[in-house]
């Protein structure tokens, strides 16, 4: 029977991108549908049981600042929390949590179920409904038609997905799930630039057959840092992970069987992630290394499965068993599921607007691995951006443009839509020019007010944020009103040149932890503020002078981002523009001068040609 249901926004896929997209759209007050093959699989962690890390933790904090789900789910499921780069400055520290898969999935499903305006629809999308260059809905395999004003596609690794284990290849979106073939074929009809990428996963081990006594054990932090600004402590029991390493015998077995690897046997055309190489890649690329670390990560408190982080592979199952059992502590281990590589379709993200809407198809948005990224966090951040923008478009409001100067989300989206990808893209702090101001600890200060203005932040977060900002403002005023001479600082045992310069207590906090502690003694009123507020004031003070310089650079970037380039701009008519640059500009169709400036091979003179034409057009429009 043919059924028709009406929604404002339809999200296809219930992975990390899809969950965030659907929830974000619903928080904006539109009616959203999340279409998934199995509702019980919403929020499944398909690969490693962990959230966050360097750069990735920043993305999770930014998602949380806009009232997204991932940070709260990770806090609910976290069984080991570690702040990476703890000995370095806050700008490059990254929160990370080992998660219980079952608890994470349960938390995500609970958040989605509790979200007003969101319906979960079970089914397989086999067709996109299009009308004169606009997405108008989807068709399900059972004949049900879902109409909508915007569609967000978050297909993960399911588009033409193929699983490889040695010479064996089979269709699959992930182990145990069929791929999406009809939808992949439909997308090919849109004439978008398509490619193939691959990712891999290690064998899963039975923790009861591991000799944990041979391993170095790694506990979590004694003072765990949460992902969500609303949470302050773990709720699940905390555990340790084990550390072991490969050895020469391991490497010998892998080398002797490279011809049986799907990757090295020529069965895979897709490019894999550079920063998450398979054990085959590690042994070929780093032939001089005698060992590679392997982190044994329990997948849950009530689950015996262990994820051996560091040995993803596409070798045959029997070879996997041989090399795994050469590793200390794993001599008698039982493999519960072999590792495998998965190859899938992605589409060139340069064919997207900065809102993640497909340039050639109004109302159609892409988010996650379909855009060439890898990682839960990257997918979730894109889902958030796409869901918010789809809802804004439905309501006839201006889109949300994340900037390189305000968020890691902005850095990622700009990288994708301006430069495209040649390999799976993952986030690092090194990708951000303004990383001193784009810290994980201040994501709420950067983004939550934007979320309040948009309408995607709920009352609980809004009230907590406004209370925090009021406390920070009072604390900063308090510190800036206390002026200290070099003599005062000497009494506080803060060494500084006796130059006669009076400094505010806030400026003195920038001298480091000891200075911050001394300032707290000198300004006893600070003790009235909560501990986390005092910590945040110290971090803000530490970077204040550097941020002032970066703000000048950010203002310059924002000026360039404000200069919009029409989508039909005629680059071919610019005399003096090289054929190579003309071709790149026509392909990329940058939305702003800032995006054009970041294209490979772009020159200052070429930018001036474009700016000159834009200014001339602006003057003509004003005169006419």
UniProtKB/Swiss-Prot annotation:
Q: Relate the protein's function as given in its record.
A: NAD-binding protein involved in the addition of a carboxymethylaminomethyl (cmnm) group at the wobble position (U34) of certain tRNAs, forming tRNA-cmnm(5)s(2)U34.
Keyword Ion transport appears in the UniProt entry: no
According to its UniProt entry, this protein's organism is Cereibacter sphaeroides (strain ATCC 17025 / ATH 2.4.3)
**Binding residue positions for FAD:** 13-18, 125, 180, 369
Keywords assigned by UniProt, alphabetized: Cytoplasm, FAD, Flavoprotein, NAD, tRNA processing
What HAMAP family does the entry give? MnmG_GidA (MF_00129)
Q: How does it assemble?
A: Homodimer. Heterotetramer of two MnmE and two MnmG subunits.
- Stored InterPro entries: FAD/NAD-bd_sf, GIDA_C_N, MnmG, MnmG-rel, MnmG-rel_CS, MnmG_C, MnmG_C_subdom, MnmG_C_subdom_sf
Any one GO CC term of the record: cytosol
The protein's name:
tRNA uridine 5-carboxymethylaminomethyl modification enzyme MnmG
Q: Which Gene3D superfamilies match?
A: FAD/NAD(P)-binding domain (3.50.50.60), GidA associated domain, C-terminal subdomain (1.10.150.570)
Pfam (any one) = GIDA
MF terms in GO: flavin adenine dinucleotide binding
Q: What is its main location?
A: cytoplasm
Segments passing through the bilayer: none
Cofactor(s), names only, from the UniProt record: FAD
In this chain, NAD(+) is annotated as bound at 272-286
The UniProt entry's sequence similarity note says: Belongs to the MnmG family.
- Is Nucleotide-binding found in the keyword set? no
GO biological process per UniProt: tRNA methylation; tRNA wobble uridine modification
The listed locations are: Cytoplasm
Q: Which NCBIfam families match?
A: mnmG_gidA
């Amino acid at each position: 029977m043919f059924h028709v249901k009406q929604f404002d926004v339809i999200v296809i896929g219930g992975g990390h991108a899809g969950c965030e997209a659907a929830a974000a759209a619903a928080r904006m007050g539109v009616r959203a549908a999340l279409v998934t093959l199995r509702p019980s699989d919403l929020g499944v962690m398909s690969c490693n049981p962990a959230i966050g890390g360097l750069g990735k933790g920043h993305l999770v904090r930014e998602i949380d600042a806009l009232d997204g789900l991932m940070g709260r789910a990770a806090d609910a499921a976290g069984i080991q929390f570690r702040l990476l780069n703890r000995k370095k400055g806050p700008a490059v520290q990254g929160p990370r949590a080992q998660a219980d898969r079952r608890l994470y999935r349960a938390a995500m499903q609970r958040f989605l179920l509790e979200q007003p305006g969101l319906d979960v629809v079970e089914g397989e999308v086999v067709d996109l409904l299009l009308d004169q260059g606009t997405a108008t809905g989807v068709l399900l395999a059972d004949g049900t038609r879902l109409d909508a004003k915007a569609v967000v596609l978050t297909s993960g690794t399911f588009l033409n997905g193929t699983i490889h284990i040695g010479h064996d290849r089979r269709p699959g979106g992930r182990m145990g799930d069929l791929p999406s073939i009809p939808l992949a074929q439909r997308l090919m009809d849109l004439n978008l630039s398509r490619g193939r990428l691959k990712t891999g996963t290690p064998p899963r081990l039975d923790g009861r057959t591991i000799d944990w006594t041979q391993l170095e054990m790694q506990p979590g932090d004694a003072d765990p840092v949460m992902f969500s600004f609303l949470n302050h402590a773990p709720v699940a029991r905390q555990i340790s992970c084990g550390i072991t390493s490969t050895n020469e015998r391991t490497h010998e077995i892998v080398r002797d069987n490279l011809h049986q690897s799907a990757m090295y046997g020529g069965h895979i055309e897709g490019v894999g992630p550079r920063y998450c190489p398979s054990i085959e890649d590690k042994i070929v690329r780093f032939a001089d290394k005698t060992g590679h670390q392997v982190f044994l990560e329990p997948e849950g408190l009530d689950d015996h499965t262990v994820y051996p982080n560091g040995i993803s592979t596409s070798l045959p199952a029997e070879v996997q068993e041989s090399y795994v059992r050469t590793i200390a502590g794993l001599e008698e281990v039982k493999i519960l599921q072999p590792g495998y590589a998965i190859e899938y379709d992605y589409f060139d993200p340069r064919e997207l607007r900065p809102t993640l809407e497909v340039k050639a198809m109004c109302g159609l948005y892409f988010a996650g691995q379909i855009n060439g990224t890898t990682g839960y966090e990257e997918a979730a951040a894109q889902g958030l951006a796409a869901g918010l923008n789809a809802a804004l478009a439905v309501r006839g409001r201006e889109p949300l443009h994340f900037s390189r100067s305000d968020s890691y989300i902005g850095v990622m989206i700009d990288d994708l839509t301006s430069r495209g990808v040649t390999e799976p893209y993952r986030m690092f702090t090194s990708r951000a020019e303004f990383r001193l101001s784009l810290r994980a600890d201040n994501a709420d200060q950067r983004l939550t007010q934007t979320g309040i203005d948009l309408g995607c932040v709920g009352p609980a977060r809004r009230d907590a944020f406004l209370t925090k900002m009021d406390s920070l403002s009072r604390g900063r005023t308090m510190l800036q009103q206390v002026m200290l001479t070099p003599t005062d600082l000497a009494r506080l045992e803060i060494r500084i040149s006796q130059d006669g310069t009076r400094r505010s207590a806030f400026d003195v906090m920038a001298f480091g932890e000891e200075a911050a502690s001394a300032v707290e003694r000198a300004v006893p009123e600070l003790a009235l503020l909560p501990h986390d507020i005092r910590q945040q004031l110290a971090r803000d003070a530490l970077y204040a002078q550097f941020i002032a310089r970066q703000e000048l650079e950010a203002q310059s970037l924002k000026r360039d981002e404000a200069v919009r380039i029409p989508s039909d701009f005629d680059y071919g008519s610019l005399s003096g523009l090289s054929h190579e640059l003309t071709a790149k500009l026509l392909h990329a169709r940058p939305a702003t001068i800032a995006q054009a400036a970041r294209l490979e091979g772009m020159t200052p003179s070429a930018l001036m040609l474009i700016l000159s034409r834009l200014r001339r057009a602006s003057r003509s429009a004003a005169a006419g």
